[in-house]
Structure formats: C-alpha cells, structure tokens
Amino acid sequence: MKRNIWGLNLQELETWVVGNGFPRFRAKQLRDYLYKRHIFHFDEMTQFSQKMRDWLKENGQIDKLVIISRAQSDDEKTIKLLLKLKDGSLVETVCMCHHYGNSICVSTQVGCAMGCIFCASTRKGLERNLTAGEILAQMYAFKELYDIPFHSIVLMGAGEPLTNYEEVLHFIHLANDPELLNISYRNITISTCGIVPQIYRLADENIPITLAISLHAPNDRIRNVLVPISKNFRIKDVVSAAEYYFKKTKRRVTFEYILIKDMNASVENAKELCRLIGKMPCHINLIPINGTEHIKLYPPEWKEIKRFQDILLKKGKETTVRKQMGDEIQAACGQLKRRYLNSVT
C-alpha cells in the first residue's frame, strides 16, 4: 500500500526515507518540495535521482484536497472554500482578513457529534475525524489559490477538536514548524464544547495555545438544551478545567457565549454567568446568534446585547461582542455546512 506523505513532519519523513535506504538529507529536500515549493508530482522533484523518483512513485502518494467551490463576502474580507477529500467527503474552511493579518478557521472533523442546536455542522452527525494532513491541507488550499500568509489559526470549523486529539495536536505542531507555516503557538486557538478530561490533558502539554470554551449558558439547565454533550460534563466542572488550564499555561481562557433571544440573554443570566466564572481571569466573547435554515432562533435586540455586556463589564469581566463576518456566504459561526450537497441532489 502506498503511503500518503502529506502531513508528515521532518522526523517522520526521515524515518521513511532512511528506512528505505536513501540518505537522510533527502528527507529535508522532500519536505521542502511539499511545504515550501508546493511541488506535488514526484517526476518534478528533479533534485532526486531517477531511482528515488521511481521509488517515490511506487511507494508514496500525496493526498491533496480538491477545491470544489469558493465564495467571497461583499466586503472581500471573508473567503470560504468547499473542499473534497480523497474519500469524497466534503469540508469547508474560511479565511478572515483582519487589520492585523489573515486568520484561517479550519475544520477538524467531517460533521460533528456534539449536537449543538444552533450549529449547522452537526445536523448529520459525525462522519469521521480528519487527519493532521487533511487539516493542514485546508491552509495550503488557500495558499495555492491566493498565496497569502497567515497570522493566526482558529480550530472552530466543523467538529470538536478535543475528540480528535492526537491528529489535532500533530497539526498544531506542523503549523508551528518554522520550516512549514511558522505560526506561533500563541496565535493558535482551539475551540471546544468543554470535553473536561481533554482540557486537563491539553493543559499538561504545556503548549501556549489559546483555549476557547463554548459555554453559551450560565447554568446546566440551559446548557443541556443548547449543547447536549454538556449532559456528560457539569458546567462547574468545565469552568474548573478552564481554571486549571489558566494556572498551568498562564494563558487566559476565552468563554464563548452565543446570545439567543428569550433563552440565555436576560439580566439574571448575565449575573449568573458572573457568579459562575467568579474571579477567574478570562475573556468573554458574546456572539449574537446567526440566522440558520434549520432552527428558529434569533439574536436579542442590540439594546439587550449591550445591557448584557454592560453587566459583565461592571463586574470586571473583559467582554467583547464578536464582529459578524461572512454571514452572507454562510461562513459565519454555526453555519459551516455542506451546501454543495443541496445543489447536486
């Protein structure tokens, strides 16, 4: 069986190349062909002997993603790609252009098992995990089209990153590699629904990445409705895990809180959220819910959003309201889904 070498780091390439009788330095050349020069046909890797090129063709393959479609927001600050994997599965990835640089939102799974009622990505459940190479390839798809640098990565696309732990961690190290994308760990954010054991595990890795927790409620009663997986993890245990993460990494945790009219956006909800978090250093990101096709949930009026934020600010909680980006191309939070399927069925 041929080995897919896309997504292998230098050490893995060295093990493969040297183990098959070729000099170690050839692995570095192979890495550069893949990740720097973007040459994906072995016959074009002319630094190698014919013998090595023949061996690569016989024993290796490079599984690239195929770009099916792309969409761009009216302000040209958000671009979404629909990508096809080798097995025919579809994933979406989004690039957001900010004043400080380009940020990419990547998917970590095909579908999602978390069941959040406001999220389009979970409607058909989880199909499978993505490999580190498939996550990395989402970034290179943008580089191939636009040749743009990336300042930061958010793992906030389809899927729960912490239930694909090993591949996600491998991807993070690849993205950080100075010879690949050279993205600082501090500019990488993992968003999780709150898989408590994995938050502790991630904290113990001692990697200074940012952790964002999709809290969305001030108590278990509301959260169990919005985020069904939370029935396995009490909200106070999620916050305790976040506190451990902060103490271990010295990285402030972000709590994401989707605001939904008549559900979790009242004055009492804001006060209860403050009591839940206590004195823990954190950032609270308020996200007015985006309109979706499959469920009738609506954002509060702006005055209600501002009132909610003001309560948090008066309690000393650093709080912002997320800027909406890409809504008209279905690229905003909670709307990453495979619309392409609707057009071909």
PLM segments and residue spans:
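Glutamine-centric residue-chemistry signal
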Residues: 29, 109, 135-138, 309
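Canonical Radical SAM [4Fe-4S] cluster-binding loop centered on the CxxxCxxC motif
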Residues: 97-134
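Short linear Ser/Thr-Pro motifs
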Residues: 73, 107-108, 121, 191, ...
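Auxiliary Fe-S-binding modules of radical SAM enzymes
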Residues: 1-89, 243-251, 257-345
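Conserved alpha-helical substructure of the radical SAM core
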Residues: 122-152
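A short loop-to-beta-strand scaffold at the N-terminal edge of the catalytic core in hydrolase folds
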Residues: 90-95
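Conserved AdoMet/S-adenosylmethionine-binding subsite of the radical SAM
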Residues: 143-152, 157-315, 319-322
